[in-house]
Design a protein with these regions (language model features):
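Alpha-helical, coiled-coil/dimerization segments enriched in small aliphatic residues
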Residues: 79-81, 201-230
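Bacterial Sec-exported substrate-binding components of ABC uptake systems
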Residues: 4, 19-61, 161-192, 249, ...
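Structured C-terminal subdomain patch of bacterial secreted/periplasmic proteins
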Residues: 148-156, 162-165, 244-313
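Extracytoplasmic ligand-binding site segments that recognize negatively charged/polar headgroups
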Residues: 121-124, 139-153, 186-208
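Bacterial N-terminal signal peptides
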Residues: 8-18
């Protein structure tokens, strides 16, 4: 099956290259080539791009923040469903993140592709894109510093360096101000991610909200009880008695996720016995800020958590 898939990809590539063979080459940047190392350790060299494809919506958002909106030629479907980018019909929709359309991607004639290290479908396209001579950068954006690094590279490519200050360094200052509000009390927290089909407890790593809470001086109860990550146990939660409980409702429409959360936890009589619930310290949080990478809104996300954890008097 894998050989058949590779054959189809190669065949599609040959067709696309044949169709584009007579097209004039894009002129190079007056400033010359720009080189950087991506998060896979690959050296990427290119002129200022004129047609950019983003294989996940978050990276389309970063490219637009970097001043590249007018050069965005293609993006994954979540650029429309999860990010309010206001893209017009000139931007090709590549389809789902996990199943991008190679035909649509090549038809968009990108001269630069933004891809994710953590998405198998993106990694599978590497050889095809390299064979086509299309510069491709792979990024691994987990936390704010990773976002800042990507924004730095993207603003260098667009030439809009002032956007690095506005959407990067200024946001960093907002985060630092929020983190400085931590008073050393080290509140214990429970983090839950609810979808339309499941509820899972998350630790301090590999998720946006968990990492933010750790930076704000919180102690995640799942970090010391890894069994919670595998099996959501109300008994274990009651035993730990967290000071705060945060639930992220995944999806642009939280209705199904909220129904799952209610069915799994909220309707259980034991849930109402938790002190955090009784005293109003159970919060449902926005998907856009605490599940997706918030990008330019990272500072806002930190500030909202600081307002809950360390309210200013």
């Amino acid at each position: 099956m894998k050989k058949y898939t590779i054959f189809l990809l190669a065949f599609a590539l040959l067709l696309a290259l044949a169709a584009c063979g007579a097209a004039p080459e894009s002129p190079g940047s007056a400033e010359g080539e720009y080189s950087f190392t991506d998060d896979l350790g690959r050296t990427v060299t290119l002129d200022r791009p004129e047609r950019v494809a983003a294989l996940i919506g978050s990276y389309a958002d970063v490219w637009c923040l970097a001043g590249g909106r007018d050069t965005l030629a293609a993006a994954a479907n979540d650029a429309w469903t999860s990010f309010d980018l206001g893209l017009d019909d000139s931007v090709a929709n590549l389809g789902a993140i996990k199943e991008p359309s190679l035909e649509t991607l090549l038809s968009a004639e990108p001269d630069f592709v933004l891809a994710s290290c953590n998405t198998a479908a993106n990694l599978e396209l590497m050889d095809v894109l390299e064979s086509a001579g299309i510069p491709t950068a792979y990024f691994d954006v987990q936390g704010f510093e990773d976002y800042l690094n990507m924004l730095d590279i993207c603003t260098a490519l667009t030439g809009e360096r002032e956007n690095y200050q506005t959407y990067g360094l200024d946001v960093q200052s907002e985060i630092e101000s929020a983190v400085a509000r931590a008073d050393g009390s080290a509140p214990t927290v429970l983090v839950i991610r609810a979808t339309g089909v499941s509820c899972k407890v998350k630790g301090s790593e590999d998720n946006v909200l968990g990492e933010m809470l750790a930076a704000l001086g919180c102690v995640n109860i799942a970090d010391s009880d890894s069994s919670l990550l595998e099996d959501l146990s109300l008994e274990a939660i009651i035993k730990a008695e967290p000071d705060y409980i945060f639930a992220v409702l995944q999806g642009s429409d939280p209705t199904d996720a909220m129904a799952t959360l209610e069915q799994t936890l909220l309707t259980n009589p034991g849930w109402g016995e938790l002190q955090a619930v009784r005293e109003g310290r159970f919060y449902t949080l926005e998907h856009e800020l605490y599940n997706l990478k918030p990008n330019a809104r990272w500072g806002e996300a930190y500030e909202k958590l600081a307002d809950i954890l360390y309210p200013q008097k």
